């Protein structure tokens, strides 16, 4: 699933190409793509046609497009969603779900989603902050993110530190890939109890999270397959710089010990057994 760097890369591309443009036509080609908009496809299109996109913003892994009507389009890419800018004459993608045409007859915006786990909806009056995503915490790169509040909240969590990093109510945008990478840099095993971290250790971990996210954004995110691309259909390149994620049995880039893969929440965690020894006290339940 796309994490903060991938979604931010898409946001930057959308901001460049759709800000200030007036929506002339909306075509919903698959109802599942707007399942979070209970009023249905006709209403979805009606409230958007004639509005102008003011900006493109992000909260964690969610995007939203504030409109001059005061409403907002909310988007989540899910596992395979893509927001692509295409010439109107370009052939339709096999999994095209929603199409936006603009009054200037320039490139159209297409929501393409093979697995249909992503989706779009309209938030009434949600231009400044859609209520549907207001509960999601700020991300570590947000200028208004509070380091002190994060450190205090993290150290109160009676759960494993990796589970805490994935909790979108604590901080948003961090998923499996970047949690593993930040923990490797911090020399912490993901099973380390969060409430056992010192304040300085928690702050150092946050610094590594920020560094990893920032570096990934510069590389356009991480692409392991053709499902994640930017608005121009281009893949990201941060996978070349990953230190542990997806590198099971390969040598740790720091000490040479083979990277270990462990089952984690129906996914996998990657760590170095030497640099990140598993703690003696490991919590199994989240809290």
UniProtKB/Swiss-Prot annotation:
The record's Pfam families line, in alphabetical order, gives: Fapy_DNA_glyco, H2TH, zf-FPG_IleRS
Task: Name any cofactors this protein relies on.
Answer: Zn(2+)
Signal peptide extent: none
GO terms of biological process kind: base-excision repair
What is annotated as the active site?
Answer: 2 (schiff-base intermediate with dna), 3 (proton donor), 61 (proton donor), 267 (proton donor)
- Is Hydrolase a UniProt keyword of this protein? yes
Cofactor binding comment, as recorded: Binds 1 zinc ion per subunit.
Q: What is its EC number?
A: 3.2.2.23, 4.2.99.18
| Catalytic activity, reaction form | Hydrolysis of DNA containing ring-opened 7-methylguanine residues, releasing 2,6-diamino-4-hydroxy-5-(N-methyl)formamidopyrimidine; 2'-deoxyribonucleotide-(2'-deoxyribose 5'-phosphate)-2'-deoxyribonucleotide-DNA = a 3'-end 2'-deoxyribonucleotide-(2,3-dehydro-2,3-deoxyribose 5'-phosphate)-DNA + a 5'-end 5'-phospho-2'-deoxyribonucleoside-DNA + H(+)
Q: Which domain of life is it from?
A: Bacteria
Please state the residue ranges covered by FPG-type zinc fingers.
243-277
Similarity field: Belongs to the FPG family.
Its biological purpose: Involved in base excision repair of DNA damaged by oxidation or by mutagenic agents. Acts as a DNA glycosylase that recognizes and removes damaged bases. Has a preference for oxidized purines, such as 7,8-dihydro-8-oxoguanine (8-oxoG). Has AP (apurinic/apyrimidinic) lyase activity and introduces nicks in the DNA strand. Cleaves the DNA backbone by beta-delta elimination to generate a single-strand break at the site of the removed base with both 3'- and 5'-phosphates.
Please name the PANTHER family in this protein's record.
FORMAMIDOPYRIMIDINE-DNA GLYCOSYLASE
* Subunit structure comment from the entry: Monomer.
Full protein name: Formamidopyrimidine-DNA glycosylase
Lineage of source species: Bacteria, Bacillati, Actinomycetota, Actinomycetes, Micromonosporales
């Amino acid at each position: 699933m796309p994490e903060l760097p991938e979604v931010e890369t898409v946001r930057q591309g959308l901001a460049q190409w759709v800000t200030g443009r007036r929506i002339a036509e909306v075509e919903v080609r698959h109802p599942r793509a707007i399942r979070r908009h209970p009023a249905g496809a006709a209403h979805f299109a009606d409230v958007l046609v004639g509005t102008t996109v003011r900006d493109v913003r992000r909260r964690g892994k969610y995007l939203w497009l504030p409109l001059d009507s005061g409403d907002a389009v909310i988007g989540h890419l899910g596992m395979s969603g893509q927001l692509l800018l295409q010439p109107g004459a370009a052939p339709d993608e096999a999994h095209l779900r929603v199409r936006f045409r603009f009054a200037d007859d320039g490139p159209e915006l297409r929501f393409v989603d093979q697995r249909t786990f992503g989706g779009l909806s309209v938030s009434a009056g949600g231009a400044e902050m859609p209520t549907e995503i207001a509960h999601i915490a700020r991300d570590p790169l947000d200028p208004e993110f509070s380091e002190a509040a994060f450190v205090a909240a993290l150290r109160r969590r009676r759960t494993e530190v990796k589970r805490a990093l994935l909790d979108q109510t604590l901080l948003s945008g961090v998923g499996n890939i970047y949690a593993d990478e930040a923990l490797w840099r911090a020399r912490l095993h993901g099973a380390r109890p969060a409430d056992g971290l010192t304040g300085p250790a928690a702050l150092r971990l946050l610094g590594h999270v920020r560094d990893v996210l920032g570096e990934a954004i510069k590389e356009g995110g991480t692409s392991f397959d053709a499902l994640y691309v930017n608005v121009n259909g281009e893949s990201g390149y941060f996978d070349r710089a990953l230190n542990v994620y997806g590198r099971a049995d390969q040598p740790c880039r720091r000490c040479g010990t083979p990277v270990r893969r462990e089952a984690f929440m129906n996914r996998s965690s990657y760590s170095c057994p030497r640099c990140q020894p598993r703690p003696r006290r490991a919590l199994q339940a989240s809290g």
